[in-house]
Amino acid sequence: MTHTISGQYGRDTIVLETGSWAKQAHGAVVYKSGNLVLLATVCAADEAKEGQDFFPLTCEYTEKLYSVGRFPGGYFKREAKPPEHEILISRIIDRPIRPLFPEGYFCEVQLQVQVLSADGDVSVAGHALNAASAALAVSDIPFNGPIAGARIGRVNGELILNPTTKEILNSDLDLVVAGTKTHIVMIEGEAKELSNEEMIAALRFAQKHIAEFVTLQEEYAKKIGVVKREVKLKVRDEELLSKVKEYAFAKLTTANQTPDKTARNKEISNVNKEVVEFFKDTIEDSDKIKDIKAYLHELEYEIVREQVLTKGTRFDGRKLDEIRSISVEINPLPGPHGSAVFTRGQTQSLGVVTLGTGSDNQRYETLEGQKEKSFMLHYNFPAFSVGEVRRSSGPGRREIGHGNLAERALKLVLPKPDEFPYVIRVVSEILESNGSSSMASVCSGSLALMAAGVPIQGSVSGIAMGLFSDSSGKYAVLSDIAGLEDHFGDMDCKIAGTRKGITAFQMDLKVTGVSFDVLESVFEQAQRGRFHILDIMEKHISKASSTLAGTAPRIIVRNIPKDRIGELIGPGGKNVRGISELTGAELYIEDDGKVTISGSNQESAEKAAKMVDGFFAEVEVGKIYEGKVKRIADFGAFVEILPGKEGLCHISKIDFKRVNSVKDIVKEGDIIRVKVLNVDKTGKIDLSRKDALEEEQV
């Protein structure tokens, strides 16, 4: 039986339909908004796999190019490996949904959202999250939702729910928010240096609309008569837990006072081994031994949180708002165009900048068509950074997500292309990690950009904030969280920005929501921390280097008429190749007539720029030009004075004396100076070497 419901979501009319498509899925919703059609499906295993001790959730967002009537690019003409933007939306779906499944629910769940029909004016991120939540709402899978997603823009100071793609281009805010009826559970986005107050106002605006769509989903589930399946959750053995606590609590408390990550992990591991060995003599059940390991983790959770909430101190002795020690190195690497090392506690990022030309743009395909980006930040998290051994298999979802967040933090302070016409690549190599490596990447990237001579608008710092709370409403906000505090805390909120305001942000929760009072505290405390970090960074470098690295390309930009691009390129690219061969420079010509000229040195670039100018320069009568003899006839020499523009120097005007043969004075390939005597109506150019010599002698 088909069930349909519709409702307003801001300016959009949303239609939800179930029971007609994908009926064997445990939950399936066709989600419509304008011409946008999404299919969201969810399936869950009946039972958890034997020995499963974590929740295996997979969220996949896929864009079908048939949704806009296009073939996929490439040889195979079918969708294959998901591109980065699909991975990022998959993460937006995953992160707010994951903590809302029941504790102890370990059945495998697969959630998929597919774009079947696209609308060029509709941004998909918020809608994809809504479709995913709706599929869970109509399924029998246990889920403490529903939730809703909202993409928020701000144009001319006015907040907009689910802005169009055109509105986003003019927006100083691009925010994706997920929430329940009463609380925010996830935020992510970028801003053009907005204040804390402006950010909170945007979140309040989002929450109001989120509540509307949550209500619509609740009505829909009630209309369908959804009954959730009964599942066996992992039941705690209170007697065994009590025995483990009695034996291990004091030992774990002592081990947790060790500030060094490596030493602490070793001590915790030793305690865990000791406890397991102690109980092995009395417990033969292997599942019970696994339970003991889980209970030890629970005790550690309790110890760390109790210390923060009752004593106001942290495992490493820091105050709640205290930042770890920071050190900075500028240009430690001689070869790259710019580099910096940013170390905060036991987290260390090496930021490296490479400057390139238009041909280095990253090209990618979206539903809107082929796109290019001239700034990219790549984040690498090798196993050695946390002292582990594992196979290297390229960037995963986490690396892509962290890199994107750091990229968004920095891209809004970059100079405009006409001020600094370089393609810029930043790579963050995480050399060691103990929490907040993405924000360390922001700091090292900002420092490296300045070291490379990129005139950014201001230094950017980033900080990760944590939250510990209890059922009574008591909470503590932590600045610059370490890995342990991220693991055992309720929140991981990353905020980056300049002294003027916020440029990027991301918040994930492990609880079912956070109040606006808490959020205001987080943003205010984060600002103090960011400014402290900026103070240290700016002691080392506070403005861009005045010179580029010797190995960086030199770029000159010219703008030519669009209808004359073909003249510059020449038949089969002859003219462009000729310029490159003569100067050693490379030319990158865009459809709008922008010509980027890059040379290995300034002389090479300037020589090529002069030749480009020559193609579009008008011949001036009375001006002396330096030209190349292209061919010789009995009656004179043809001289190229500008690219593609030849004139005739008659034999009578080659020299002061009588000339019997042109070849007696000039030969093909000679560079000579000639004066333009006349340009007739047909464009024929009359040249004189004799007049040029005479004028220069005077």
Swiss-Prot record:
<keyword id="KW-0963">Cytoplasm</keyword>
<dbReference type="InterPro" id="IPR012162">
    <property type="entry name" value="PNPase"/>
</dbReference>
<dbReference type="GO" id="GO:0006396">
    <property type="term" value="P:RNA processing"/>
</dbReference>
<dbReference type="InterPro" id="IPR015847">
    <property type="entry name" value="ExoRNase_PH_dom2"/>
</dbReference>
<dbReference type="InterPro" id="IPR020568">
    <property type="entry name" value="Ribosomal_Su5_D2-typ_SF"/>
</dbReference>
<keyword id="KW-0808">Transferase</keyword>
<feature type="binding site">
    <location>
        <position position="486"/>
    </location>
    <ligand>
        <name>Mg(2+)</name>
    </ligand>
</feature>
<dbReference type="GO" id="GO:0003723">
    <property type="term" value="F:RNA binding"/>
</dbReference>
<dbReference type="InterPro" id="IPR015848">
    <property type="entry name" value="PNPase_PH_RNA-bd_bac/org-type"/>
</dbReference>
<dbReference type="InterPro" id="IPR036612">
    <property type="entry name" value="KH_dom_type_1_sf"/>
</dbReference>
<dbReference type="GO" id="GO:0004654">
    <property type="term" value="F:polyribonucleotide nucleotidyltransferase activity"/>
</dbReference>
<dbReference type="Pfam" id="PF03726">
    <property type="entry name" value="PNPase"/>
</dbReference>
<dbReference type="GO" id="GO:0006402">
    <property type="term" value="P:mRNA catabolic process"/>
</dbReference>
<dbReference type="InterPro" id="IPR004088">
    <property type="entry name" value="KH_dom_type_1"/>
</dbReference>
<dbReference type="InterPro" id="IPR027408">
    <property type="entry name" value="PNPase/RNase_PH_dom_sf"/>
</dbReference>
<dbReference type="Pfam" id="PF00575">
    <property type="entry name" value="S1"/>
</dbReference>
<feature type="domain" description="KH">
    <location>
        <begin position="553"/>
        <end position="612"/>
    </location>
</feature>
<comment type="similarity">
    <text>Belongs to the polyribonucleotide nucleotidyltransferase family.</text>
</comment>
<dbReference type="InterPro" id="IPR004087">
    <property type="entry name" value="KH_dom"/>
</dbReference>
<dbReference type="Pfam" id="PF00013">
    <property type="entry name" value="KH_1"/>
</dbReference>
<dbReference type="GO" id="GO:0006401">
    <property type="term" value="P:RNA catabolic process"/>
</dbReference>
<comment type="function">
    <text>Involved in mRNA degradation. Catalyzes the phosphorolysis of single-stranded polyribonucleotides processively in the 3'- to 5'-direction.</text>
</comment>
<dbReference type="InterPro" id="IPR012340">
    <property type="entry name" value="NA-bd_OB-fold"/>
</dbReference>
<dbReference type="GO" id="GO:0000287">
    <property type="term" value="F:magnesium ion binding"/>
</dbReference>
<keyword id="KW-0694">RNA-binding</keyword>
<dbReference type="Pfam" id="PF01138">
    <property type="entry name" value="RNase_PH"/>
</dbReference>
<protein>
    <recommendedName>
        <fullName>Polyribonucleotide nucleotidyltransferase</fullName>
        <ecNumber>2.7.7.8</ecNumber>
    </recommendedName>
</protein>
<feature type="domain" description="S1 motif">
    <location>
        <begin position="622"/>
        <end position="690"/>
    </location>
</feature>
<dbReference type="InterPro" id="IPR003029">
    <property type="entry name" value="S1_domain"/>
</dbReference>
<dbReference type="GO" id="GO:0005829">
    <property type="term" value="C:cytosol"/>
</dbReference>
<keyword id="KW-0460">Magnesium</keyword>
<keyword id="KW-0479">Metal-binding</keyword>
<feature type="binding site">
    <location>
        <position position="492"/>
    </location>
    <ligand>
        <name>Mg(2+)</name>
    </ligand>
</feature>
<dbReference type="InterPro" id="IPR036345">
    <property type="entry name" value="ExoRNase_PH_dom2_sf"/>
</dbReference>
<dbReference type="InterPro" id="IPR001247">
    <property type="entry name" value="ExoRNase_PH_dom1"/>
</dbReference>
<dbReference type="GO" id="GO:0000175">
    <property type="term" value="F:3'-5'-RNA exonuclease activity"/>
</dbReference>
<dbReference type="Pfam" id="PF03725">
    <property type="entry name" value="RNase_PH_C"/>
</dbReference>
<keyword id="KW-0548">Nucleotidyltransferase</keyword>
<dbReference type="InterPro" id="IPR036456">
    <property type="entry name" value="PNPase_PH_RNA-bd_sf"/>
</dbReference>
